[in-house]
Amino acid sequence: MKWLLWLGYIFSFGLLYLWIVKKSKQIAQQPNTKLVESTSIPFKVKDFVSACGGKENFVNIKTTPTQLIVTFKDVNSVSLTKLNALNIKGINKNQNQFRFVLGNFVNELKKKIEDEQ
């Protein structure tokens, strides 16, 4: 009679194990649609704007998930030494457009630049 009890334990825990494995595979197959964005900017926005030649020097600002793409009126007024002091990960220049590789806080930086007076 004891063997029947053990057989019941094995059967029920076996079914529970198979159900857990099935559910975990379903969860693992779901695509991650969330984009992680940070709201903390590791430098002062005013320092970034002044290093770029002031708010009036900005013509157009676009973002990718980790880059800020800025078109400037006067490229010569952009101070690369001041920008490098802000620990920007990368700066790419193409004619009057700069690509700043910053991180996942670029949308917050874009909002603060546009809101700045």
Curated annotation (Swiss-Prot):
It is a single-pass membrane protein. GO terms for molecular function: protein-N(PI)-phosphohistidine-sugar phosphotransferase activity. InterPro entries: Glu_permease_IIB, PTS_IIB_1. Residues 42-117 form the PTS EIIB type-1 domain. Keywords: Membrane, Phosphoprotein, Phosphotransferase system, Transferase, Transmembrane, Transmembrane helix. Its main location: membrane. One of its GO terms (biological process) is phosphoenolpyruvate-dependent sugar phosphotransferase system. It is an enzyme of class 2 (transferase). SUPFAM superfamilies: Glucose permease domain IIB. It is found in: Membrane. The keyword Cell wall biogenesis/degradation does not apply. The phosphoenolpyruvate-dependent sugar phosphotransferase system (PTS), a major carbohydrate active -transport system, catalyzes the phosphorylation of incoming sugar substrates concomitant with their translocation across the cell membrane. This is Putative phosphotransferase enzyme IIB component MG129. The lineage of its organism: Bacteria, Bacillati, Mycoplasmatota, Mycoplasmoidales, Mycoplasmoidaceae.
